[in-house]
Amino acid sequence: TEIYTGEDIFPYTTLFRSIIVAVLTTIVTLGLLGGYSSKTVSAILGTAIGVVIAAVAAMAFGKAAGITGYNVSDIEALNYVGQNTKIKIGELLFAGIIISALGAVMDVGMSIASTIQEIYETDKTLSMKRLFVSGINVGRDMMGTMTNTLIFAYVGGAITTLVINYAYDLSYRQLANSYVIGIEIMQGLSGSLGVVLTVPITALIASFLAVRKK
C-alpha cells in the first residue's frame, strides 16, 4: 500500500508556503496601518489576488521558457542545502519572485482602496461604476511607475552578473538567450502583471464594499 504525503498530492509546497506567508504579511501589515476596515479588506483581497497572479505567471513563464530554480547562479551552494534539508530549492526562485513583488502589489492595492474610500466619503451619491472608473483612472498612472520600480529593482540586483557576462564578450544573441536574462524577464513580467491586475481587482472590490455600506 502506497502512502501519499502532502507533497505527493501538491508538489509545490515551497511556492504555496511563500504565498501563505505573503498573504499573512499583507493582513498584518495593512491591518496595522489602516485598521481592519472595508478599505483594508479591499486592499488585502486585491493584494492577495495580485500575488497569486504573479506566482501563476512566473510558473507559466518558467515552464514555457524552460527556466527552473536550478538555473540560478548560486546553484552549487543551494544544492548542498537541498541535500541536507527538506527545502525544495527548485521552487526558491519563484518564491523569491512572490516576496519581491509583494511590496509593490501591496502599495498599489492600498493606494487604490484608499483613493476610492476618500472619493466615496466626499460624495456618497456616487455609484459603484463611477467609483470603479475613478479607481482605474488613478491606478493607470500608478501601473507605470510601480512596474518601473520592480523592473529596475530586478535589474539592479543582477547588474554584476550582467556585467560579467558582457565582459566575456558574448554576442547579443548569446546574452539574450542566457538564463540570467530569461530570469530577469520572467521576474519583471510576472511582477508587473501582478501590479497591473491588482488595480482593477482592488478597484472593483473597494467600490463594491463602499457602496454596500450605505
Where in this protein do the model-derived segments appear?
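Structural signature of hydrophobic alpha-helical transmembrane segments
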Residues: 11-24
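Hydrophobic alpha-helical membrane-insertion segments
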Residues: 45-62, 141-157
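Hydrophobic transmembrane alpha-helices
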Residues: 48-52, 61, 92-109, 155
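Short helix-loop junctions at transmembrane helix boundaries
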Residues: 35, 56-92, 158-182
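Hydrophobic alpha-helical transmembrane segments of membrane transport and translocation systems
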Residues: 153-155, 159-214
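Helical hairpin unit composed of two closely spaced alpha helices linked by a short loop
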Residues: 102-112, 116-162, 169
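Single conserved hydrophobic/aromatic residue that forms the stacking wall/gate
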Residues: 2-14
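Pore-lining and gate-forming transmembrane alpha-helices of multi-pass membrane transport proteins
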Residues: 43-51, 82-83, 87-99, 145, ...
